Design a protein with these regions (language model features):
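Short glycine/proline-centered loop/turn elements that form peptide/ligand docking sites
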Residues: 20-21, 38-41, 96, 118
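Vicinal oxygen chelate
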Residues: 1-4, 8-16, 44, 57-82, 84-118, ...
Length: 118
């Protein structure tokens, strides 16, 4: 089986208040807003995509790496075939229009892998 190409790479920051966080990044760093919603926002900084996700309180304040792919199932198959593991199985998040899973690479680094759904 061939490798699954990555369509977008992003760093995700968990935030408690989406509007406040977006205001901070746009006003402090003059970022270019690509997506702005209560469930997921993205801005572009020097070619890198930074994503903000609600839930940034308590133990959900981590920063994480994420990959957007066209075929989540194929990507997860390649993850396991190449020594990684699935730490959270695929699930649909209809409000965000994504199907998402979490994986660990061969070194234990956690990565979110998502596929856009309609």
């Amino acid at each position: 089986m061939t490798a699954t190409p990555v369509d977008k790479t992003y760093v995700m920051l968990m935030v408690a208040d989406m509007a406040r966080a977006m205001r901070f990044y746009t006003e402090a760093f003059a970022v270019t807003v690509a997506i702005n919603s209560p469930y997921w926002s993205e801005f572009v900084v020097a070619g890198a995509t930074i994503a903000l996700h609600p839930g940034g309180s308590g133990n959900e304040t981590h920063t994480g790496l994420g990959f957007e792919v066209k075929d989540l199932d194929a990507a997860l198959q390649r993850v396991t075939e190449t020594g990684g593991r699935i730490t959270s199985p695929p699930r649909d998040r209809q409000q965000e229009r994504i199907r998402v899973a979490e994986i660990a690479d061969t070194e234990g680094n956690l990565i979110t892998v998502a596929e856009l759904i309609n």
